[in-house]
Amino acid sequence: VSSPAFPHEFSELGGLRFMGQRFILDGYVHQLACYPNVPTRFMVSGLDIMYALGSERAGELLEDEFKEYDKLKEKLDYAREYIRNMSIDEWRSTLYNGWLYTLIPLLQPIGEGYPSYMQTKAWLDKSLNTALSSWAQLRHDTILYAKQPYAGLTAVPPEAKHVGYVEPYPEVYLRLRNLALATINGLSSMDLLSDGWRERLEDLADLLDKLAVISIKELENRELTEEEEAVIKYFGGRIERILAYE
C-alpha cells in the first residue's frame, strides 16, 4: 500500500498492489541456482546471472562451483537457454528487463577489427566487472519491489564427531592400575597416605581401569558408550587434577 505524504496527493498516488513483489528475471535465475534446486548450495553468486546472460568468462570462473554442486550447471544452462530465446518484445516489456538487456554486449568477447587491448582477457574481465556492478545497482534500486530468491529451510548434517583414540594396550593400563592400588595399600598400612593423595590415586586407578576397557573395545571394533567417549574427551583435565600440586 502506498502512503502519500499529503492528503491532497491521495487521488494521484494512492493505490494497492495485490502482489507487490514483482517477478524479475535474475531472481528467477538465482532461485534455480540454490537449494532445493541445487542440493546443498545456499549462497548464490552474481556470476550466475552473468553466465545465464551469455558470459562464457563467468562460466570459467564458476568452474569450481560446477564441480562442487551437482546440477548447478544444468540449472544455469537451462536459464541460459531460456534467456537466449527471449524475444525483443520480452526484453522491452519492463525497464528492469531492458537494463539487463543492455548488459549482454559487455559480456561477449571482442572480435577482430577492434583495438588489440579490447581483445584481451583482462578487458573481458573488466567488462564483466562493469556488468556485475551495473546489475548490483539495479538490484539495489529495486530490492523492495522485487520477489527475492531464497534457499529452502533445511539443516546441514552435523560433522562426524571425532571422539579420540586410546593406544590399545589394555595390559599396560591394568598393570598401572594394580600399581596404583598397591601404592594405596602400602602407604595406608604405614599411615603415610593423606586423604588428598588417596583420592588422587583412587581416581588414577579408576581412570586406568576405564582406559583398559576402552582399549579392549577398540581392539574388538566395538562402539564406545557416551561415558567412555567422555573419558577420552576430558582425559587431559582429569590427569591435570590428579597431578596438581597439593
Identify the role of each PLM range:
Residues V1-E246:
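Polar/charged low-complexity regulatory segments
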